[in-house]
């Protein structure tokens, strides 16, 4: 309730003028007065004003985070999948589950959908990362398009590169072309250790250096408590060992530009395509997710 103080209500004459109408010598005298009423509003100290509700909190109730271990009741044209790649405002989602009543259910598992993110998720500040398990709606199975309407809870999150639900991190460097830089490798290792997930160090292009240099890096990394893997995408040396380390987990391959990340993914696709679940996940982008069922 608002009250007005009688003492504060003031009536003031702003202007009092005399105006003449008519020609010279025959004017009609009219007096006009203008008044302005002003008052000072006082708040009642006994009344508590309710604060405005937080719009972000209200919107978050419309899209609560889904528990990772629970499956929502899917309706027609909905599906559950994992984000494989992200480019600008578009996400590629690998379908993992569809409604049980959906005809051709088996044919839709593993399909890749090009998706956009629901605007509400952006307004409430909910990030959507590669590796996220998501709920998609309005699926067009012909054009393979859909909309991401919600995100499941995460097990883990990597900040650089931004990716979620990772079990295993592969740090890939090359021994030459470009030559491995100890400072850059240390920075990658420190950031990886802060995540708290399993780490594998792989050194590519071992055919371009001497055996003495390979042994030198093996001794150095072992002194840092890492067991390095040496490989050559060009000669396919050590690829089997890397594939073995990628089994039954979600892995991310990171490293500087030019070390052979894309080449490694391509050779894994071509050599182990029969053992890879959802091989569409392997794309030559800045990071890669792998799903092995060996």
Curated annotation (Swiss-Prot):
Domain CP-type G, first and last residues per copy: 155-294
Residues bound to GTP: 255-263
Transit peptide, start-end: 1-68
Chief site of localization: mitochondrion
Gene Ontology cellular component list: mitochondrion
Compartment(s) of residence: Mitochondrion
Source organism superkingdom: Eukaryota
Keyword annotations from UniProtKB, A to Z: GTP-binding, Mitochondrion, Nucleotide-binding, Transit peptide
Molecular function terms, GO-annotated: GTP binding; GTPase activity
SUPFAM superfamilies in alphabetical order: Nucleic acid-binding proteins, P-loop containing nucleoside triphosphate hydrolases
Region forming the signal peptide: none
Family, per entry: Belongs to the TRAFAC class YlqF/YawG GTPase family.
PANTHER family reported for this sequence: SMALL RIBOSOMAL SUBUNIT BIOGENESIS GTPASE RSGA, SMALL RIBOSOMAL SUBUNIT BIOGENESIS GTPASE RSGA 1, MITOCHONDRIAL-RELATED
Name of the featured protein: Small ribosomal subunit biogenesis GTPase RsgA 2, mitochondrial
Source organism: Arabidopsis thaliana
